[in-house]
């Protein structure tokens, strides 16, 4: 009997906590209007996930803790569409893809995307549909090591869009290895020979997500970097020179690929190039991509990069500092809001700490990072793991889609909405 009473007491305590959580999320802050929107059926966490997302974006102190007790978004819809090949109209509508240019300005300025993926199928779909518009073009590099079921599902989606294709040449991508750089080069070759015209190319990985809309990305490029490449970076610091002075060869122990150092020292860079260190992420003009694929300096630099550690952190920025390269920025530094990343080494200076968890030096975002993310001037953010914290991407995705549709200058198709009614209690224009 005493055990039964204890169980009942525990249930009562949980019920009281749930009521408090619900009232907390429903209670507006003083700056918010007391007028409430039309209300659908109440569930255990309010109008899930909108109200919880609103509380997270507004930085309400208890919201990240509350998020742990609420149900996670259900991804079965995405998997059901892709593991059951069928009518492409059903797939594009069911997965809420935008199927027309949203303004004349966007229709006249096409972007190319390179997306390298190897896991998290639902996250890939969320990323692609966030950046997808029919006037852009997308090259997907699927890691050769990815499971066949994963590859088949990606192919099912890609088959439904004329402007999305999978790279014909794939790599077994190694962390910090040359294959990461080669995967981008493979896609660039496909993009320049495709029938689609594009102005700039942007590279992404499967753990990135946009925090700016397509229109905002175009405005940023045109206003700040017209006909210029964005490759944030500086002359290689002394403390990381071992990455390029010592040889790092890829090898495969028990199925994983690594690029550890060996005892052989590298030859000097070709053409007496000054080596820079910077971001692996870029925004490049089409002419610069054509230069990368044809110029002897670029070809020799690519060959030299085959046995250095993390060559993608050196290759793009080094070549973009050449004065004769198309769109070059020889005097640039770290400027260029390409990616919002929280590094552990920068905690306290650049950001207020990771609210999720650090993997190596990089923050995998948690719900508590959302206020920082939406205030960032960057175009994209990294790093997300929906398998760990699915609500982070879900909140960003819903907010992003509302912003996209608010900026549209064409009639909105019903299937572009994620739900019939939105219950975000926040200002999207801040």
From Swiss-Prot:
Belongs to the glycosyltransferase 14 family. One of its GO terms (molecular function) is acetylglucosaminyltransferase activity. Glycans are attached at residues 87, 272. Pathway: Protein modification; protein glycosylation. It is a single-pass type II membrane protein. This is Probable beta-1,3-galactosyl-O-glycosyl-glycoprotein beta-1,6-N-acetylglucosaminyltransferase 7. Residues 26-430 are extracellular. Residues 1-8 are cytoplasmic.
